[in-house]
C-alpha cells in the first residue's frame, strides 16, 4: 500500500456476499457436472468440458448485466423467427445471446482456472485478518482513494462500495466516492459510460497535478 500513490477500486466489495458465493457455486457445479471434466484431469486428454464451462459463463454473464438493461435490449423478442418453435432451441434473443457468450468463452478460458479463481474470490475477506474489521485494515493509509460504484450493479452493489468508503473515512484515509447512474449493470466499467470516464479523468488530473515523480537513474 505504501508504494501506491492513489487507487481507484471500481465496482467491488471487501468480501463476497452469500449471493456472490451462490452464483460462483452454480458455475463450479456446472463445470464439475460435465462428464468431460473428469475431476480436473481433462487436460491430460487434451479436451475441455465445453458444455459445463459454457453454462458457467452464462451464469456469470447474467450477473454482469442488469434487469432493466436486459429488458430494454432483449425483452421477449424472438430470435429470427415469427413464432415459438415449441422446442428447446433458442426461441428468444436473450437465449441466443447467452449461448453465444457461453460457447465463445470456452475458446479463450480454461475450466479448472474458473474453479480456482472463483474459489479464491469467495475466500477473500479483507476484514477477516484484522480484529478491527475494515477500519483496522485501512489504518494509517497514505494512499488517495476514489471508490466508484454503478447504480444498477447487483453483483457488487452500491452498499458494498459505500461500506468501503465508510471504513476508509473512519480510518482517516483520503477517500472520495462516486456512484454512476446507469442501467448497464456490473459491466458498466467495460463500456462507454461518459460519466464514469469523466470521473476517472477528473480524479487522475487532480491527483497528479502537483505530484513530483522520482528521478530515473
What feature does the model see in each segment?
Residues 9-104:
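Alpha/beta-hydrolase-fold enzymes
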Residues 140-145:
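Short, proline-enriched alpha-helix->beta-strand connector loops that line the catalytic pocket
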Residues 147-149:
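Short beta-strand/loop motif that positions the catalytic acidic residue
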Residues 152-156:
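Acidic catalytic loop of the alpha/beta-hydrolase fold
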Residues 168-182:
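Catalytic histidine neighborhood in serine/cysteine hydrolases
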Residues 209-215:
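Conserved small/polar residues in nucleotide/adenosyl-binding loops
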